[in-house]
């Protein structure tokens, strides 16, 4: 590692598994002071051994909780928004509750964290905000991902909007649109869909693999 994040403070959501977990460890390995959060703090039990400085329970659906933790930890240089929820369904099978939950976790949570941490970045005259979107978004349509794709498209939109508003004040805002990543979340969704569709877990996993241009699932470390 190069130590390129030495002296930087990074705040991450959904650091208990998958991309968030791998990124927390990667940031720490590069020298950052990492503040990792997750709805389930027990999933972050191994992070401090990997150099992560702080771990906190956080429900990103709560504005009060986000604001309180932001005030507690103080200004950061890097905000990594990774919390997400994958709903499976079409417009005809997606309830209002499914739609609202998808947008609350996938898009509005980023609105909350950016609003909480951006003032500190502006005071310093620099900062980096990284939002995890998805290939299932404005990038491309994926069958059976109606609410998920729409909410992740919103992530692309809010990323561009914040970038346009604050680039001249030293704030960089980017989104990453991964393909399907091997993770505990994917394992759980594969088992759920196998049961619903009357297929094996292996058949469902192959459906995910077949959609990937490189012919395999990605890894969180990648």
Describe these PLM feature segments:
Residues 83-87:
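Conserved NAD(P)H cofactor-binding loop of Rossmann-fold oxidoreductase domains
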Residues 134:
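Residue(s) in the substrate-gating loop at a strand-loop-helix junction
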Residues 119, 164-165:
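Alpha-helical segment proximal to the catalytic Tyr-Lys
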Residues 90-91, 98-103, 208:
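Substrate-binding pocket helix/loop in short-chain dehydrogenase/reductase
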Residues 9, 16-18:
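Conserved glycine-rich cofactor-binding loop
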Residues 94, 141-149, 161, 189:
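Active-site loop-to-helix junction immediately N-terminal to the catalytic Tyr of the SDR YXXXK motif
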Residues 114, 151, 159:
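Active-site helix of classical SDR
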């Amino acid at each position: 590692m190069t130590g390129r994040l030495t002296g930087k403070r990074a705040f991450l959501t959904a650091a208990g598994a998958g991309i968030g977990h791998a990124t927390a460890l990667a940031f720490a390995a590069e020298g950052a002071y990492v503040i990792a959060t997750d709805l389930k703090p027990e999933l972050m039990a191994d992070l401090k051994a990997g150099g992560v400085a702080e771990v906190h329970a956080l429900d990103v659906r709560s504005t009060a909780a986000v604001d309180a933790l932001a005030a507690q930890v103080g200004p950061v240089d890097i905000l990594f928004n990774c919390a997400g929820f994958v709903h499976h369904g079409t417009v005809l099978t997606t309830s209002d509750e499914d739609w609202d939950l998808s947008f609350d976790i996938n898009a509005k949570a980023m609105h909350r964290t950016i609003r909480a941490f951006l003032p500190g970045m502006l005071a310093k005259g620099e900062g980096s905000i990284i939002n995890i979107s998805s290939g299932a978004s404005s990038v491309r349509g994926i069958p059976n991902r109606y609410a998920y794709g729409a909410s992740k498209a919103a992530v692309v939109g809010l990323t561009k909007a914040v970038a346009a508003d604050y680039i001249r004040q030293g704030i960089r805002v980017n989104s990453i649109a991964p393909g399907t990543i091997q993770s505990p979340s994917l394992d759980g969704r594969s088992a759920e869909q196998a049961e619903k569709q009357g297929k094996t877990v292996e058949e469902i996993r192959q459906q995910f693999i077949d959609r990937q241009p490189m012919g395999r699932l990605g890894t969180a470390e990648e």
